[in-house]
């Protein structure tokens, strides 16, 4: 099952306030290993987006997830224990933006309790756009020096 398969369900749900990191599976300890889906929504405000690089970084989401920003797919991640980041610069605008994360837990996948959902921190990163200078426009000067019978180069 892909998180994208559950996108239509997200608009018909009632959401409760939670704190991230969050493990939705631990709330039902009678059935810890059932296949399930978690939906996370958040609104946030940005300014100066035209001059910014904006990314969202997840330290961990278990198990398979997809992320939408302003109803557009930002990306999918299939590896539950690793950190990942999506460039969302083209998806955000000045003012209120929304994010939706759908995470799918499928059993069996591990020999121990793995949890489910956004189990680590999430960071929204906004920084000034970088300007890339083509290599042919970069000039440098260097001189080689001897130091303890080894050669090294110093670039000025």
Regions found by a protein language model. Name each.
Residues 1-26, 45, 102-105, 124:
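Accessory carbohydrate-binding/adhesion or oligomerization-edge regions at the termini
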Residues 30-31, 35-134, 141:
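Accessory beta-strand-rich segments of carbohydrate-active enzymes
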Residues 129-156:
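Surface beta-strand/loop "capping" patches
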Residues 15-22, 29, 146-156:
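Short, intrinsically disordered, low-complexity segments enriched in Ser/Thr and Pro
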């Amino acid at each position: 099952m892909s998180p994208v398969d559950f996108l239509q369900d997200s608009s018909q749900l009632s959401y409760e306030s939670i704190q991230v990191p969050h493990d939705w599976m631990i709330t039902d300890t009678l059935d810890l290993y059932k296949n399930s889906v978690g939906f996370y929504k958040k609104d946030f405000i940005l300014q100066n987006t035209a001059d910014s690089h904006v990314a969202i970084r997840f330290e961990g989401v278990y198990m398979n997830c997809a992320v939408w920003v302003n109803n557009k797919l930002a990306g999918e991640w299939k590896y539950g224990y690793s950190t990942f980041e999506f460039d969302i610069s083209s998806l955000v605008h000045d003012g209120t933006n929304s994010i939706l994360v759908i995470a799918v837990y499928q059993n069996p996948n591990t020999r121990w309790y793995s949890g489910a959902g956004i189990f680590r921190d999430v960071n929204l990163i906004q920084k000034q756009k970088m300007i890339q200078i083509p290599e042919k426009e970069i000039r440098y000067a260097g001189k080689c020096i001897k130091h303890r019978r080894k050669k090294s180069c110093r670039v000025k």
